[in-house]
From Swiss-Prot:
Positions of crosslink type Glycyl lysine isopeptide (Lys-Gly) (interchain with G-Cter in SUMO2): 319, 650
GO cellular component, one term: NuA4 histone acetyltransferase complex
Name of the protein this chain belongs to: Enhancer of polycomb homolog 1
Disruption phenotype: Mice are viable but display growth retardation, homeotic transformations of the axis and sterility in both males and females. Male sterility is caused by defects in generation of elongating spermatids.
Biased composition (Low complexity): 346-361, 564-577
Gene name for this UniProt entry: Epc1
Pfam families for the chain: E_Pc_C, EPL1
Species whose genome carries this gene: Mus musculus
Species lineage: Eukaryota, Metazoa, Chordata, Craniata, Vertebrata
Compositionally biased region (Basic and acidic residues): 311-333, 788-797
Location of the region described as Disordered in the Swiss-Prot/TrEMBL record: 310-403, 484-513, 528-577, 779-813
UniProt similarity note: Belongs to the enhancer of polycomb family.
Cell location: Nucleus; Cytoplasm
UniProt cross-references to InterPro entries, sorted A to Z: Enhancer_polycomb (IPR024943), Enhancer_polycomb-like_N (IPR019542), Enhancer_polycomb_C (IPR009607)
Length: 813
């Protein structure tokens, strides 16, 4: 890195001088390292100061000792002390003054002169005292007047006599002394003055000049940039002002025509009064003989419905053109086109004027067509007929996609008294009422939270979208505790009879147990099960469980009189073992256990209702939930199919049930009657709104991931479990969370998934289902009734043999 070097530059007085603080200054050795191998640079001092011995000694010491800090010499002027001389001038006695800062009082005293006596002046004054009466202050005043009265050239003696009001002899002596001293002085004045800038500009580079004048810079005018935007604004302003002037002219002509019409009406009445035509017969004869005069301007045949998209045809039938007024004529006013924005403009509609064509002798169509404007307040459709202003078009958030009417197109207004015929609306509102569009209570697993009522649909690109619906229980659903789903609590889900509408705020009376049992028996309750993609057959045990499940499903479809049930085994090798049937003794023990469980759950429900009566009274009125343990469900299924039937089916390849994150599956759903599936989808609690007015749909994209497959012979871990759920009809679902790898599947009766009646069901199975439905489950206020899998760290046990050890509740919601 090269060292810094300096070169002599011309001093610039306009350049500001830098001001350094003590901490900003570099060290002395950094200064010494700077190379000054340049010609003789002026030091900024006078030649006499440069030749002083203390400065020369400092420079020579630096050359001798080098750049060592210890040998540096700070140039300090020498001071001499003469105590005798000091004592002769100043008195020895010193008294502390009352104040250290003296301020001269405002009085009529003369100002003190700026000139100070020196030793030579003092010698001259002492010599002059012998001849004349003069004091040092008087001498200073005289010299001060002479210095201030003279500029570059000293004043003459005659001018000095005019300045000084003293004796001529004294003036002459002082003047001669002043002229002699002024000539010997190097400066222009004897009074030390601050050196100022000369007007001729010669002192620009003089470093001793202080208080320089400001550089007079010409203030240039900042011209406004005339760009295209400002030019367009001026054009718009001119257009608006011209339109206002034209409107005022039209109003003036309209009022003038009205006044003429009034005068003509008065003349007609006077003529009729003079003729005695009180009955109007003469007037009618004259009107009959009068030939209809064709209007000067053509009347456009444009229906009014074309001009407004907010008015229905029925509402505008009464606003047609009035034919009985013959004096009115319609004028064509096409909208003015601007070349900068070529747009497809609608055909200009006509606005009826209040004056006859004969009353407009000096009115030209050019003046009328120059600007688009409403002619009168008597025309309610004039604002609609006229096109939108450019400001509104520019501020339109849709931009180029904004709606614009096209010529020749007729737009019908929407029927506000009717709702849309959407598939999810009820048939009474004109919809299809399809069960595929039901709203269900939805719970996400990642992150684990309850969303409220939602429904799944496939969007663009196969993405699954959740449409959310508003309900009165949203505040409660959002704070549900998902870890307390096993505790029984009344559920408000049964309050909704229909679940095909997006608004679930309207509640109906809850169904009693008998009605629910009737619906179950008649299979009017349907179950929505989403299709899942087939997983790679990497495990032989997994493949065997799939084959067993498919064989059971086909057998159930082939026999219309009975349901099928798939049983679980303890390990993979025993997937094809025989089904264990219940004996009479086991059935009696099972009934006693069910009764004891029912009593315990009823007691817990009463305690929970008393504790939460103040906070969730409204939510507990219709919140009913029924439970059924897995063993009872398996027993009810075994009553419909023998153990020999479970082992006699052939194994074939088919689609099996899988798992999914948040219940997001790639394809649409399959509808089967009374189907048990071991899945972990999002909660689908089917609810029903009765009105579609206050609908709040919030679609949200759900990430689709492939879940793990839960099969008959697949061994689950402690962190993952399966949830078995049964959906009956529109708003009932049986959920069986289980820790054992069991798939309880009651398959549909045929391939078309048509619900059938339970005509061939034994009475014992129906009694068992009725007894199980009497149990009430507990659902806490901070949790949702859903099908989210709950972690169960229990060991795998047989589902049918060990009923008391591993009894899991099945929720009927």
């Amino acid at each position: 890195m090269s060292k810094l070097s300096f070169r002599a530059r011309a001093l610039d007085a306009s350049k500001p001088l830098p001001v350094f603080r003590c901490e900003d200054l570099p060290d002395l050795h950094e200064y010494a390292s700077i190379n000054r191998a340049v010609p003789q640079m002026p030091t900024g001092m006078e030649k006499e100061e440069e030749s002083e011995h203390h400065l020369q000694r400092a420079i020579s010491a630096q050359q001798v000792y080098g750049e060592k800090r210890d040998n540096m010499v700070i140039p300090v002027p020498e001071a001499e002390s003469n105590i005798a001389y000091y004592e002769s001038i100043y008195p020895g006695e010193f008294r502390m003054p009352k104040q250290l800062i003296h301020i001269q009082p405002f009085s009529l005293d003369a100002e003190q002169p700026d000139y100070d006596l020196d030793s030579e002046d003092e010698v001259f004054v002492n010599k002059l005292k012998k001849k004349m009466d003069i004091c040092p202050l008087q001498f200073e005043e005289m010299i001060d007047r002479l210095e201030k009265g003279s500029g570059q050239q000293p004043v003459s003696l005659q001018e000095a006599k005019l300045l000084l009001k003293e004796d001529d002899e004294l003036i002459r002596e002082v003047y001669e002394y002043w002229i002699k001293k002024r000539k010997t002085c190097r400066g222009s004045s004897l009074i030390p003055l601050v050196k100022q800038e000369k007007r001729d500009g010669s002192s620009t580079n003089d470093p001793y000049v202080a208080f320089r004048r400001r550089t007079e810079k010409m203030q240039t005018r900042k011209n406004r940039k005339n760009d295209e935007a400002s030019y367009e604004k001026m054009l718009k302003l001119r257009r608006d002002l011209s339109r206002a002037v034209t409107i005022l002219e039209m109003i003036k002509r309209r009022e003038k025509s009205k006044r003429e019409l009034l005068h003509l009406t008065l003349e007609i009445m006077e003529k009729r009064y003079n003729l005695g035509d009180y009955s109007g017969e003469i007037m009618s004869e004259v009107m009959a003989q009068r030939q209809p005069v064709k209007p000067t301007y053509a009347i456009p045949i444009i229906p009014i419905t074309n001009s407004s998209q907010f008015k229905h045809q029925d509402a505008t039938d009464s606003k047609e053109f009035k034919v009985n007024k013959q004096d009115k004529a319609d004028l064509i006013r096409p909208k003015r086109k601007y070349e900068k924005k070529p747009k497809v403009l609608p055909p200009s509609a006509a606005a009826p004027q209040q004056q006859s064509p004969a009353a407009l002798p000096g009115f030209s169509a050019k003046d009328l067509n120059q600007y688009d404007f409403p002619s009168s307040d008597e025309e309610p459709l004039s604002q609609v007929l006229s096109g939108s202003s450019e400001a509104e078009e520019e501020n339109d958030p849709d931009g180029p996609f904004a709606f614009r009417r096209k010529a020749g197109c007729q737009y019908y207004a929407p029927h506000l008294d009717q709702t849309g015929n959407w598939p999810w609306t009820s048939p009474k509102d004109g919809g299809l009422g399809d069960v595929r569009y039901r709203y269900c209570l939805t719970t996400l697993t990642v992150p684990q939270r309850c969303l409220g009522f939602a429904r799944r649909r496939v969007g663009r690109g196969g993405r699954v979208v959740l449409d959310r619906a508003h309900s009165d229980y949203d505040s409660m659903f959002h704070h549900l505790d998902l870890d307390m789903l096993s505790s029984p609590q009344p559920s408000p889900v049964n309050q909704f009879a229909n679940t095909s509408e997006p608004n679930t705020s309207d509640r109906s009376s809850s169904k009693d147990l008998s009605q629910i049992l009737v619906d179950i028996k008649s299979c009017r309750w349907r179950h929505f099960r989403p299709r899942t993609p087939s997983l790679p057959d990497s495990d032989s045990g997994e493949l065997s469980s799939r084959k067993l499940h498919r064989s059971i499903s086909r057998a159930g479809a082939a026999q219309p009189g009975a349901h099928t049930c798939s049983t679980s085994t303890q390990n993979r090798s025993s997937s094809g073992s025989a089904h264990c049937a219940f004996t009479a003794e086991q059935y009696q023990q099972h009934q006693q256990q069910l009764a004891l469980m029912q009593q315990q759950q009823l007691a817990q429900t009463q305690q929970q209702q008393q504790a939460n009566s103040s906070s969730s009274a409204a939510a507990q009125q219709g919140f009913v939930s029924k439970t059924l343990d897995s063993a009872s469900a398996q027993f009810a299924a075994s009553a419909l199919m023998t153990s020999e039937q479970l082992l006699g089916f052939k194994v074939k390849d088919d689609v099996v049930l899988g798992l999914g994150v948040n219940g997001v599956l790639p394809a649409s759903g399959v509808y089967k009657g009374l189907h048990l599936s071991s899945t972990t989808p999002t909660a689908l609690v089917h609810t029903s709104p009765s009105t579609a007015g206050s609908t709040l749909l919030q679609p949200s994209n759900i990430t689709q991931t492939s879940g793990s497959h839960s099969s008959l012979s697949h061994q689950v871990t402690a962190a993952s479990s399966a949830t078995t759920q049964v959906l009956f009809g529109n708003n009932i679902r049986l959920t069986v969370p289980s820790s054992v790898p069991t798939v309880n599947s009651v398959t549909p009766i045929n391939a078309r998934h048509i619900p059938r009646t339970l005509s061939a069901v034994p009475p014992s199975a129906l009694k068992l289902a009725a007894a199980a439905n009497c149990q009430v489950s507990k659902v806490p206020s901070s949790s949702s009734v859903d099908s989210v899998p709950r972690e169960n760290h229990e060991s795998e046990k047989p589902a049918l043999n060990n009923i008391a050890d591993n009894t899991v509740a099945m929720e009927v919601t």
